[in-house]
C-alpha cells in the first residue's frame, strides 16, 4: 500500500513538473528572447525532468564512470548520448565525451579498425555538439585540434590508416577539416583557449599538411601548403611581434628550406 502511494506520488510529481515546464516554455516562446529549438525527442525528456535534470545528470555521470572502468563501452556510449540530451547546451559535455571516445576508449583496442571506429565516433559526437552549440569557439577548437592530432603519424601508429578511412567514409581530408574548425574557433570568441595559441595551431596544421602531402608524393600540394604555412607565420609575426612563446623565425626558416627542396623535385599533381 505504501509502495503504491509512493509510486502515485512520483507520477503526480512528474506530471506537475511537466505542465509547469510547458508553461515556462510557452512563456519564453511568447517573449522576444530567442529560444533554441530542440527536436521533440530531446525536448520531452527535458520538460519531464524539469528541476530533477541535475540529479539525473549526476546519476548518469556516475554510471558513465562505472561503465568506463568496467570497459562496457557500448553501454557507455548510450549513457553519453543521454547526458548530451540532458545538457545539450554545455560544450564541456561534448568535449569531454568526444575526447574520451577518441582517445581513451580507442587506446583500449589493438586493431586499427577498432581504434578507428571509436575515433570516428568521437569526432562525429563532437560535430553533433557543434550543431547544438553553434557559437562555442572552445568546442570548435577542440574538434579542429582532434582532426590535427589524431592523424599525426609521429604520435599514432595507424594515423595513415585513419586518414584514409576518413576520406573513404566521410569524404574529408583531416587537415582541411582541422583548418575549418580552427578558423571557426577564432570567429566565436573562445573562453578557455588563448587566441594566439589557436593562430599558432593553424600555422602548425598547414605545416603538417605540407609534410603529409610530401609523404604521399603530392609535391604540388605540399608546396601549396608550405606557402600557406609560411604566409600564416608571417602574418602571425606581424600581428604579434612581441610574442616570445614560439620561435617564429625558426619555423619560417624551416619552411623556406622545405620549399626550396620541394621545388627541385618532379611534380605529380594528384589533387
Sequence positions of predicted segments:
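Long, charge-rich alpha-helical interaction segments
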Residues: 245, 249-266
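Short, Lys/Arg-rich N-terminal segment immediately upstream of the first membrane anchor
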Residues: 1-5
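Short coil/linker segments at helix-helix boundaries
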Residues: 27-83, 89-133, 141-228, 232, ...
Amino acid at each position: 500500500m505504501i509502495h503504491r502511494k509512493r509510486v502515485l506520488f512520483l507520477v503526480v510529481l512528474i506530471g506537475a513538473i511537466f505542465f509547469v515546464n510547458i508553461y515556462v516554455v510557452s512563456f519564453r516562446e511568447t517573449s522576444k528572447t530567442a529560444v533554441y529549438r530542440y527536436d521533440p525527442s530531446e525536448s520531452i525528456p527535458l520538460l519531464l525532468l524539469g528541476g530533477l535534470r541535475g540529479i539525473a545528470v549526476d546519476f548518469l555521470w556516475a554510471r558513465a564512470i562505472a561503465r568506463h572502468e568496467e570497459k562496457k563501452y557500448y553501454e557507455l556510449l548510450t549513457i553519453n548520448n543521454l547526458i548530451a540530451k540532458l545538457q545539450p547546451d554545455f560544450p564541456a559535455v561534448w568535449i569531454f565525451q568526444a575526447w574520451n571516445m577518441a582517445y581513451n576508449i580507442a587506446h583500449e583496442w589493438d586493431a586499427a579498425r577498432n581504434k578507428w571506429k571509436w575515433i570516428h565516433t568521437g569526432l562525429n559526437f563532437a560535430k553533433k555538439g557543434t550543431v547544438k552549440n553553434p557559437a562555442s569557439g572552445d568546442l570548435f577548437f577542440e574538434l579542429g585540434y582532434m582532426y590535427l592530432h589524431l592523424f599525426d603519424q609521429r604520435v599514432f601508429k595507424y594515423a595513415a590508416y585513419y586518414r584514409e578511412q576518413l576520406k573513404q567514409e566521410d569524404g574529408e581530408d583531416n587537415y582541411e577539416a582541422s583548418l575549418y574548425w580552427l578558423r571557426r574557433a577564432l570567429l566565436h570568441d573562445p573562453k578557455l583557449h588563448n587566441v594566439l595559441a589557436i593562430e599558432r595551431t593553424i600555422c602548425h596544421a598547414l605545416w603538417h599538411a605540407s609534410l603529409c602531402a610530401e609523404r604521399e608524393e603530392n609535391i604540388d600540394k605540399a608546396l601549396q601548403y608550405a606557402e600557406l604555412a609560411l604566409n600564416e607565420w608571417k602574418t602571425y609575426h606581424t600581428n604579434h611581434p612581441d610574442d616570445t612563446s614560439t620561435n617564429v623565425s625558426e619555423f619560417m626558416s624551416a619552411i623556406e628550406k622545405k620549399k626550396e627542396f620541394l621545388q627541385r623535385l618532379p611534380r605529380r599533381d594528384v589533387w
